[in-house]
C-alpha cells in the first residue's frame, strides 16, 4: 500500500498538469487515473469539484477548438505550476486513500453497503420466493416429525379453550395459496386484458399501496371452520400413525405411509413464524439429546477404554441401539477389550437412553437425523435469501435514520435499530400483496427507530405509552401557540386533549428533561449550574454568625445574674446543655422543692426583662 501511493500521486499530478495545459479534462481521463476500489459517488464528486476549483473544466467528451476559444481564449497558454499540481495531487491522493482504504467502521460500512446492487420489483419477488421455498422445506421436514404434529394439535386445543388466539397457530393454507398462484400464472399466460381507459381512475396509485393498505385493514386470517376441519383430519391421521407404530414398529411400510399422510395435511397449514421457531427448537432439542448420548458413548469407548477412534466409528455406525454391540466388540479380543468390558454397563445405559428417545419420538435415530438435515437445509436456504434482501435495502435504513438524528441517540445506533426493523420486515414481507418491499419495510424501520429513541434516548426512561402522550401534548401545545400567540394553560390543554387537568400537569412535569449540574454558565463558561443552586441542608453563613452572636450575648446577660439564678435558667431552657429540664429535675439538683425553683426562675426572668439587659437581646428577635 505504501508503494502504491507515490505512483497514484504521480499519475494524478500528470493528470492535473495535462488539465492545466489544455484547460479541460474528460470524465474518462479522470476515471482512468482513479483507483479501481474508489466506488463511492460522493468521493468521486469531491474529486471532480477539486479539479474544477483549479480552473479545469471536466466534460463528457473533449470540446472542439472553437468552443475552447470562445470559453477562454487562453487555452494552451496556461502556466503550469508544478508545486500547485503536486499539492493538488497529494490532496486528491489523501482523499482517495481516506475513501478507499479507511479503517473507520462507519466508512467501511457505507462502502460495503454501496457495493450491493439495488433490487428491482422482480428481484424482490425472486428473493421472497426463495425465502418461501426455504421455509416450505423446513415445514415439510417438521411435518414428518410426529412430535411437531402433537405440539400443533396441543396448541389448537388451547385455542379451543380460549387460551390462545387462532392467529398464533394458523395464518393461512399453503395449498390455497399455490392454487391462487397457479391461477394468476395462467391468467398472465393468457395475455393482457383489454381495459376501458375511460373507466380507469387517473389518480389511482401506481404502486398499488392504497389497495394493499385496504387489504390489510380488512378481515384477515384463515376461516375458523376450515381450520377446525383440517385440524380434525390431522388429529385422525396422527391417531392412525400412532396405532400403526404400536402395531408394526417404526420401520414398517404401513407406518411410513401413515406418517406421509399426516405430513401431507400438516404442510397444507401455513404456520406463523413463532410457532415454526418453537417446532424447530423442539426438534433441535431431540437431536441434541441423541448427540449427547452418542458423545458419552464415544468418550467411554475411545477415551476411557482406549478403543481406536476409527475402529469405533466403523463399528458403531448403525448400531446405536444395538445392545449387543459391546459384546460383539469384545469378541474381537483386542488389547482394549478389558477396558471396554469395564465400561460396558455405562455404554449399554446410554444405548437404552437412545432407545427410549426412539420410542418417545416414534422414529428411528436415522430418521430423526434425516429430518434434522432436511430442516437445516431449508433454514440455510431461507437465511441466505433473507441476507440478500437485507443487504440490498440497507440504504433505505440510512435514508430513514437521517431524519431522526439529534433526538438522543447516535447515528450508528439509529442505523442499528433500523436494521433490526428491516430484518423483521423481511420476515413478514408478503410479495403477493403487490407492493414493493421498500413500501412495507419503511414502516417497520421507522417503528424500530422511534421505539428505540423512546426507550433509550432519555436519561430517565419513560414508558412508550407516556412518550406518545407527551408527543401529542407537545403537538397540541404548538398548535395552540400558533393559534393564540401565547403558551396554552394546563386547563386549555386538558380541555383540548380530553384529559384531567392533574394528569396534564403530571405529563408536563414528566416531559421535562433532566439537566446536568455541570452545565456551563456564562460566556466564559468558567462556572457551572451547580454553583448557583442553594444547598438547603447546610446552614447559611448569616444564620451561623447570628447564632454565635446570640450565644455570646446570652452568656453575657446570664453573667449579670446570681450563679444560682443563672444555673436554674440554663437547666430550664437547656442553654449550653444537651436538653432542657423540668422543675422537679432542677429541684432535685438544688435539693429544693419545685415551687422554690419556679420562684427563682420567675425572679431571674424579671431581672432579664429590665431594659438594661433586654435591650441587648432585642436585636435578635424576628420582627417579620
Swiss-Prot record:
One of its GO terms (cellular component) is cytoplasm. Residues 197-217 have a biased composition (Acidic residues). HAMAP family: Sigma70_RpoD_SigA. A motif (Interaction with polymerase core subunit RpoC) lies at residues 413-416. Residues 557-610 are annotated as: Sigma-70 factor domain-4. It comes from Xanthomonas campestris pv. campestris (strain ATCC 33913 / DSM 3586 / NCPPB 528 / LMG 568 / P 25). Interacts transiently with the RNA polymerase catalytic core. It comes from the Bacteria. Keywords: Cytoplasm, DNA-binding, Sigma factor, Transcription, Transcription regulation. One of its GO terms (molecular function) is sigma factor activity. Residues 197-224 are annotated as: Disordered. It holds the Pfam family Sigma70_r1_2. Belongs to the sigma-70 factor family. RpoD/SigA subfamily. This is RNA polymerase sigma factor RpoD. Its main location: cytoplasm.
Amino acid at each position: 500500500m505504501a508503494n502504491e501511493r507515490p505512483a497514484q500521486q504521480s499519475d494524478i499530478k500528470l493528470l492535473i498538469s495535462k488539465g492545466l495545459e489544455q484547460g479541460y479534462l474528460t470524465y474518462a481521463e479522470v476515471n482512468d487515473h482513479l483507483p479501481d476500489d474508489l466506488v463511492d459517488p460522493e468521493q468521486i464528486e469531491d474529486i471532480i469539484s477539486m479539479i474544477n476549483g483549479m480552473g479545469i473544466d471536466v466534460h463528457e467528451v473533449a470540446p472542439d477548438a472553437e468552443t475552447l476559444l470562445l470559453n477562454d481564449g487562453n487555452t494552451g497558454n496556461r502556466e503550469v505550476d508544478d508545486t500547485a499540481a503536486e499539492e493538488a495531487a497529494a490532496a486528491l491522493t489523501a482523499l482517495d486513500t481516506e475513501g478507499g482504504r479507511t479503517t473507520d467502521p462507519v466508512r467501511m460500512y457505507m462502502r460495503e453497503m454501496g457495493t450491493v446492487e439495488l433490487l428491482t420489483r422482480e428481484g424482490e419477488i425472486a428473493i421472497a420466493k426463495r425465502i418461501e421455498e426455504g421455509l416450505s422445506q423446513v415445514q415439510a421436514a417438521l411435518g414428518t416429525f410426529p412430535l411437531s404434529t402433537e405440539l400443533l394439535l396441543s396448541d389448537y386445543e388451547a385455542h379451543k379453550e380460549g387460551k390462545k388466539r387462532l392467529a398464533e397457530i394458523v395464518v393461512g393454507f399453503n395449498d390455497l395459496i399455490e392454487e391462487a398462484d397457479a391461477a394468476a400464472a395462467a391468467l398472465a399466460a393468457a395475455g393482457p386484458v383489454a381495459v376501458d381507459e375511460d373507466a380507469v381512475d387517473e389518480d389511482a396509485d401506481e404502486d398499488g399501496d392504497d389497495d394493499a393498505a385496504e387489504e390489510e385493514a380488512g378481515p384477515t386470517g384463515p376461516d375458523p371452520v376450515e381450520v377446525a376441519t383440517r385440524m380434525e383430519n390431522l388429529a385422525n391421521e396422527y391417531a392412525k400413525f400412532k396405532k400403526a407404530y404400536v402395531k408394526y414398529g417404526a420401520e414398517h411400510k404401513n407406518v411410513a405411509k401413515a406418517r406421509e399422510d399426516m405430513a401431507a395435511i400438516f404442510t397444507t397449514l401455513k404456520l406463523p413464524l413463532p410457532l415454526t421457531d418453537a417446532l424447530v427448537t423442539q426438534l433441535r432439542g431431540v437431536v441434541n439429546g441423541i448427540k449427547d448420548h452418542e458423545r458419552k458413548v464415544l468418550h467411554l469407548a475411545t477415551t476411557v477404554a482406549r478403543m481406536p477412534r476409527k475402529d469405533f466409528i466403523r463399528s458403531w455406525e448403525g448400531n446405536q441401539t444395538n445392545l449387543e454391540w459391546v459384546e460383539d466388540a469384545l469378541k474381537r479380543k483386542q488389547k482394549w477389550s478389558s477396558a471396554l468390558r469395564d465400561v460396558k454397563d455405562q455404554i449399554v445405559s446410554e444405548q437404552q437412553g437412545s432407545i427410549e428417545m426412539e420410542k418417545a419420538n416414534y422414529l428411528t435415530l436415522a430418521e430423526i437425523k434425516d429430518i434434522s438435515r432436511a430442516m437445516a437445509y431449508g433454514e440455510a436456504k431461507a437465511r441466505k435469501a433473507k441476507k440478500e434482501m437485507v443487504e440490498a435495502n440497507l440504504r433505505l435504513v440510512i435514508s430513514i435514520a437521517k431524519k431522526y438524528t439529534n433526538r438522543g441517540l447516535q447515528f450508528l445506533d439509529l442505523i442499528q435499530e433500523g436494521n433490526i426493523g428491516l430484518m423483521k420486515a423481511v420476515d413478514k414481507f408478503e410479495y403477493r400483496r403487490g407492493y414493493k418491499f421498500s413500501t412495507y419495510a419503511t414502516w417497520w424501520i421507522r417503528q424500530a427507530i422511534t421505539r428505540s429513541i423512546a426507550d433509550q434516548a432519555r436519561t430517565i426512561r419513560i414508558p412508550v405509552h407516556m412518550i406518545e402522550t407527551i408527543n401529542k401534548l407537545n403537538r397540541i401545545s404548538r398548535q395552540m401557540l400558533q393559534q393564540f400567540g401565547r403558551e396554552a394553560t394546563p386547563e386549555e390543554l386538558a380541555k383540548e386533549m380530553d384529559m384531567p387537568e392533574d394528569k396534564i400537569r403530571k405529563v408536563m412535569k414528566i416531559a421535562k428533561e433532566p439537566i446536568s449540574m455541570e452545565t456551563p454558565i456564562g460566556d466564559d463558561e468558567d462556572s457551572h449550574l451547580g454553583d448557583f443552586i442553594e444547598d438547603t441542608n447546610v446552614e447559611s453563613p448569616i444564620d451561623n454568625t447570628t447564632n454565635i452572636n446570640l450565644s455570646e450575648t446570652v452568656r453575657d446577660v446570664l453573667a449579670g445574674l446570681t450563679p444560682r439564678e443563672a444555673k436554674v435558667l440554663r437547666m430550664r431552657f437547656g442553654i449550653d446543655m444537651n436538653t432542657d429540664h423540668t422543675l422537679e429535675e432542677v429541684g432535685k439538683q438544688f435539693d429544693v422543692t419545685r415551687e422554690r425553683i419556679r420562684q427563682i426562675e420567675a425572679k431571674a426572668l424579671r431581672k432579664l426583662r429590665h431594659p438594661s439587659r433586654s435591650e441587648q437581646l432585642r436585636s435578635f428577635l424576628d420582627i417579620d
